[in-house]
Amino acid sequence: MDQQKVNLLNYNYSQLRELLMAWDEKPFRAQQLFQWIHQVGIRDFAQMTNLGKVLRNKLSQLACIDLPEIVACQKSADGTHKWLLKLECGNCIETVFIPEANRGTLCVSSQVGCALNCSFCSTAKQGFNRNLSTAEIIGQVWLAARELSDNNGAHDKKITNVVMMGMGEPLLNFDNVVSAMSIMMDDLAYGLSKRRVTLSTSGVLPEMERLREVSPVALAVSLHAPTDELRNELVPINKKYPLSQLISLCKRYFKDEPRRKVTFEYVMLKGVNDQPEHASQLIKLLHNVPAKVNLIPFNPFPLTQYQRSSRETIDAFRDKLIKHGINTITRKTRGDDIDAACGQLAGEVKDKTTRSQRWQKLHFMSKTDKSTELTISSEEIA
């Protein structure tokens, strides 16, 4: 990116309006420009024909619309797409699109790597490098929308839902994530409702409180254990924000919207958190919580110590929760043949802690060996 130019993808609508006014332009120009960028998907200011030649020239001199670079794309047998995106700094992140009969869900990353070190998560093994900018977050949506439209026809596959469940802990990149989500929900951009944008967190309580006030999107909590002792091992941030505090906040999170529920994600690990006593503990923990539970079959990755629970064990766990009145489903595993399933996103992170060099090499080789559709550069796609 030209260091003298501002990347307009970093601006939500209100910020873009202020920017144009600072450049002595009429406020209504922000709406036109915003729609060109996000609804039409145009990056070339010369093609924005209703802006006027003087403004187009000014934008060319002062601004740019810079995106991550698509360096690889994989497509699963089930239709799931995974893109490897290279950032300006040289790191890579991953973005996944999951098509279903009546919806298309895009899984978006918020950080390069992750600092929380959850023991069952592939991204955690990469270490942490930095937060993504608003442009790098919303750029994933922009690129996916264009790729799906270009390759499948304008109406074949469409993004109807976004989940902030990719690489990183979204609430540790609060301002940029909230700004990007505001663009996703803006009718002048992608027009998603607040119920169709979901943020997943491991439980960063102060930022959960802030999120509740400023951006009431759907909330998913990475729970994964029914006791502090076990969750301390699986999700180490629990040592700072224990279950009693987390559940207390979840009980009141949607107090003004009693029909909304918090989704609790629970990865099923063989012999670790999947036994009948764990189900009983979870039932007790979620008593009087407006909750629904997603049971997630564990997705293995290189060097992991964990195994996936059997289908029979998962079904028995689910049935016990349902019997006690907890809305529970088992998440269908999608894209695991291309390492796009939950917990498998890894990208390529220049880890400042250098903890992951050996793991990265093994992970890359396993992905290369398994993939039958590891593709091509963005230029070849275009």
From Swiss-Prot:
Subcellular location: Cytoplasm
InterPro entries: Aldolase_TIM, Methyltransferase_A, RlmN_N, RNA_MTrfase_RlmN, rRNA_lsu_MTrfase_RlmN/Cfr, rSAM
Listed SUPFAM superfamilies: Radical SAM enzymes
Main location class: cytoplasm
Keywords: 4Fe-4S, Cytoplasm, Disulfide bond, Iron, Iron-sulfur, Metal-binding, Methyltransferase, rRNA processing, S-adenosyl-L-methionine, Transferase, tRNA processing
Catalytic activity, reaction form: adenosine(2503) in 23S rRNA + 2 reduced [2Fe-2S]-[ferredoxin] + 2 S-adenosyl-L-methionine = 2-methyladenosine(2503) in 23S rRNA + 5'-deoxyadenosine + L-methionine + 2 oxidized [2Fe-2S]-[ferredoxin] + S-adenosyl-L-homocysteine; adenosine(37) in tRNA + 2 reduced [2Fe-2S]-[ferredoxin] + 2 S-adenosyl-L-methionine = 2-methyladenosine(37) in tRNA + 5'-deoxyadenosine + L-methionine + 2 oxidized [2Fe-2S]-[ferredoxin] + S-adenosyl-L-homocysteine
Superkingdom of the source species: Bacteria
Any GO CC annotation of this UniProt entry: cytoplasm
Keyword 4Fe-4S: yes
Disulfide bonds: C107-C342
One function term, GO molecular function aspect: tRNA (adenine(37)-C2)-methyltransferase activity
Residues binding [4Fe-4S] cluster: C114, C118, C121
Cofactor binding: number and manner: Binds 1 [4Fe-4S] cluster. The cluster is coordinated with 3 cysteines and an exchangeable S-adenosyl-L-methionine.
4Fe-4S in keyword set: yes
Note: Reaction proceeds by a ping-pong mechanism involving intermediate methylation of a conserved cysteine residue.
Protein name: Dual-specificity RNA methyltransferase RlmN
Species of the source: Legionella pneumophila (strain Corby)
Biological classification of the source: Bacteria, Pseudomonadati, Pseudomonadota, Gammaproteobacteria, Legionellales
